[in-house]
Amino acid sequence: GTRYSHSDLNNTLTALEALYYSRHLVKDAPDAGKDLNWKAAIEFIQNCQNLKSHNKQPWVSDDPENKGGFIYFPGKSMAGVAKDANGRTALRSYGSISYAGMLSYAYAQLDKSDPRVKAVREWLIKNYTLEENPAMGAQGLYYYYYLMTKALTIYGTDMLELPNGKKVDWRKDLALKLMGNQAQDGSWVNQKSARWWESEKPLVTAYSLISLSLIHRGQ
C-alpha cells in the first residue's frame, strides 16, 4: 500500500501494533512458530530517529530543533530539510511521525527510561501544541492527535511539563479541542488540509472518536 520500495515508520508501526495486541494469542501456543526479530525492528525504528547516540547514519542531526524527533524513513522527512546552526542540511523531525516512533518503541516494549524514548519525549514536549502538527502545519493534524493520544496513554503520561515550567493536562486540552472541532452532523474533517486523506470524514471521525475514547478511559 505504498509507492516506496522499502519500509517506512508508519507501516512499521501498524505491523507492530497488530503484533502487540495479539501477542497473548500466541504466547502459549505450541505451534506459535518463530517470534519476530525484535532487535531488527528496534534497529529500524531508531534508524528513523534524529539521535546520534543511537543512529550513526550520516544524515542524523543532534541540533536543538531536531534532536530526538523522527522522520518518515531513513533519509526522508515529510517535513523536508533545513540548515542547522552549523550550516549543515538536517532532515526535519516532525510531530506525527515522532509520536509514531514513540509508540513503536512502546510496542517493542522499551521502557520510558530508555534514552531513545526519553529523547523523543523531550522533543515532543518541546514542540507541544494542539494548533498544528509540528513542522507540518495542518497536514496530518488529526493523525497527530490520534498518535499523541495513543503514545502518551501507553506510557502512562498524565501531565506534560513544558520547557517554561507550565504543566499541561493534555487529555483535557485535546478533548476540548476535538469537541470544539466537531461538525453539526457529528463528524470531523480537517478543514485546512486534505493531505493523507484528512478531507475524508469517515477517516478523521475515526481518529477523533478513538482519541476521545482513550482520553475518557484515561489508561
Regions found by a protein language model. Give the residues of each.
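An alpha-helical repeat/solenoid feature that recognizes helix-turn-helix modules
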Residues: 1-176, 180-219
